[in-house]
Amino acid sequence: MLCFWRTSHVAVLLIWGVFAAESSCPDKNQTMQNNSSTMTEVNTTVFVQMGKKALLCCPSISLTKVILITWTITLRGQPSCIISYKADTRETHESNCSDRSITWASTPDLAPDLQISAVALQHEGRYSCDIAVPDGNFQNIYDLQVLVPPEVTHFPGENRTAVCEAIAGKPAAQISWTPDGDCVAKNESHSNGTVTVRSTCHWEQSHVSVVFCVVSHLTTGNQSLSIELGRGGDQLLGSYIQYIIPSIIILIIIGCICLLKISGCRKCKLPKSGATPDIEEDEMQPYASYTEKSNPLYDTVTTTEAHPASQGKVNGTDCLTLSAMGI
């Protein structure tokens, strides 16, 4: 849901951040001669996107009257770095300064402003420019804040839900939805100061098919991303029709092909099995012929062997019996 206070808050931050977008500082040699009207101390919060160039300006004081210019840089967790320029000797001096990306914008006698070539998260901190002149001291103080654009992802979830995520942004991104839904947001802070925001929303209304996730951040403005919702039971039915039915049809086709192959193989084997009895019958023919031919011999041999065994007992009845057997 879009909230007015969130939108206003973003707008205010953008206005504060305009200063960081300046590419040049006022010409110190064209400032008013009456420096008494200049504020002695100015505090400014500066927002710079990571990877961009930052330019921090000293007070608009005529350099012809400058005695000493000093930049004091206090980064988180580090000792203060001091960069100074002495006008009478034109000497520069550095103390506890190791970051080579932080330098003078030009030669100090022409432009004592400070520049950071590529802003990183470790450059967050306090930057102070002090200018000493015969009339007093003037100071510009900057609280430098680094902006990190988040990586945005969005995707549909289950049961008519949608997820929108802004990963590792600084400051934390704001996420809203159109139309409104039942939403839950979760923030996860990281050790480097960035924040991941994850918003999950659910819509009961079946007529809502497309929703919009709006991600608001200082570096990117408002991004509107569309997400197509699933249709619950209709979606399951669609998945069933789309995936399951074609699979079943493919299985049926494969089964029919297998059955046709099996049936064809059986038909090919049937003539071979029908010819087998003929072969067996042909193989048995010689044995059958031999038996028929050998039976008379067997009978003759049996008769011949029976006659000698009966010769010692031949009498009237036995002779008739033997004669009958011989016939």
From Swiss-Prot:
Glycans are attached at residues 29, 34, 43, 96, 159, 187, 192, 222. Residues 147-226 form the Ig-like C2-type domain. Phosphorylated on tyrosine residues. Highly N-glycosylated. Residues 261-327 are cytoplasmic. Residues 26-145 form the Ig-like V-type domain. Keywords: Cell membrane, Disulfide bond, Glycoprotein, Membrane, Phosphoprotein, Receptor, Signal, Transmembrane, Transmembrane helix. It is a single-pass type I membrane protein. GO terms for biological process: heterotypic cell-cell adhesion; negative regulation of interleukin-6 production; negative regulation of macrophage migration; negative regulation of neuroinflammatory response; negative regulation of T cell migration; regulation of neuroinflammatory response. Gene3D superfamilies: Immunoglobulins (2.60.40.10). Residues 24-239 are extracellular. The keyword Membrane applies. The chain crosses the membrane at residues 240-260. One of its GO terms (molecular function) is signaling receptor activity. It is found in: Cell membrane. It comes from the Eukaryota. Disulfide bonds join 58-129, 81-97, 164-213, 183-201. GO terms for cellular component: cell surface; external side of plasma membrane; receptor complex. Belongs to the CD200R family. CD200 and CD200R1 interact via their respective N-terminal Ig-like domains. This is Cell surface glycoprotein CD200 receptor 1. It comes from Rattus norvegicus (Rat).
